[in-house]
Regions:
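A structural signal for well-ordered alpha-helical segments within the folded catalytic domains
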Residues: 17, 44, 124, 224-228
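Fold-independent oxyanion-binding glycine-rich loops
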Residues: 84-86, 108, 150-151, 178-180, ...
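Acidic/histidine-rich catalytic neighborhood of metal-dependent amide-processing enzymes
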Residues: 117-193
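Acidic-enriched catalytic cores of C-N bond-cleaving enzymes acting on peptides and small amides
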Residues: 167, 182-183, 192, 212-229
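Acidic/His- and Gly-rich active-site-bordering loop/insert found
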Residues: 2-116, 135-142
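Short small-residue beta-strand/loop micro-motif enriched in glycine and branched aliphatics
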Residues: 111-113, 208-214
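Flexible glycine/proline-rich, aromatic-decorated loop/lid segments
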Residues: 189-205
Length: 229
């Protein structure tokens, strides 16, 4: 069967308001990995969303927050995987928010809320893309897997535990990692790596008095000077 992508794009355009509202629903649900706030409610919301596109999601327990796994069969024996996460960072400091962090407020054509950019937009876009493809053609061109974890924002401490316990679930011919970059009119960019996390606590000691006027005590250096170097 020949799949014309323009038909899928047209369907997405016709249902754009519906898909945007779905993203706003995800953003309205707190899911802070560090504190556990809203995690179980978010897990259920993601599972319901995957059920809505024809999948049978599994909630796989880990020592921390669960991993959600789902699979949909396609037309051939090739399998493509989507890695995403449903957790977000804390919302502090609250006084810097123009609108409440879970309001998913729309201003000037953009949605504002915790997690709208990292990574609930990525999760929503993939679910909506699969939904649109199935609505247009009734099937998918390849098998699709969803691996959605809930601890990415704290360094994915239990993703390796999941991977070692369920290697067969991770078997795919290719993967899409949570987000991506695509400039208008250009093909999607392929990245070969990503930065990790580094936390440093630095203590330093300098002279009590200026000994060379051209070199004042290092402790007088503004804290920002340590950043971005």
């Amino acid at each position: 069967m020949k799949f014309e992508m323009q038909n899928v794009y047209d369907y997405i355009d016709q249902h754009a308001d519906e898909y945007v509202e779905f993203l706003r629903t995800l953003v309205r649900q707190p899911s802070i990995a560090d504190t556990g706030e809203g995690i179980q409610e978010m897990v259920q919301l993601v599972k319901q969303s995957l059920q809505g596109i024809g999948a049978r999601p599994q909630e796989i327990e880990t020592p921390g927050n669960p991993v959600i796994y789902a699979e949909l069969k396609g037309e051939c024996n090739k399998t493509f995987g989507f890695y995403d996460h449903y957790d977000v960072q804390p919302v502090d400091p609250l006084n810097e928010w123009v609108t409440p962090p879970y309001s998913a407020d729309v201003r000037d054509g953009a949605i504002y809320g915790r997690g709208v950019a990292d990574n609930k937009n990525g999760l929503a876009s993939k679910i909506c893309a699969v939904d649109a493809f199935r609505k247009v053609y009734g099937k998918l061109p390849v098998n699709v897997k969803f691996i959605v974890e809930g601890e990415e924002e704290i360094g994915s401490p239990n993703l390796e535990v999941f991977a070692k316990a369920h290697p067969e679930l991770l078997a795919c011919d290719g993967y899409n990692w949570e987000g991506g970059v695509k400039e208008p009119g250009e093909p999607a960019q392929v990245h070969f790596g990503a930065k990790g996390l580094l936390y440093v606590e630095l203590e330093c000691q300098g002279p009590r008095r200026i000994r060379i006027r051209a070199m004042p005590p290092s402790l007088q250096t503004p804290p920002g000077a340590w950043c971005g170097r």
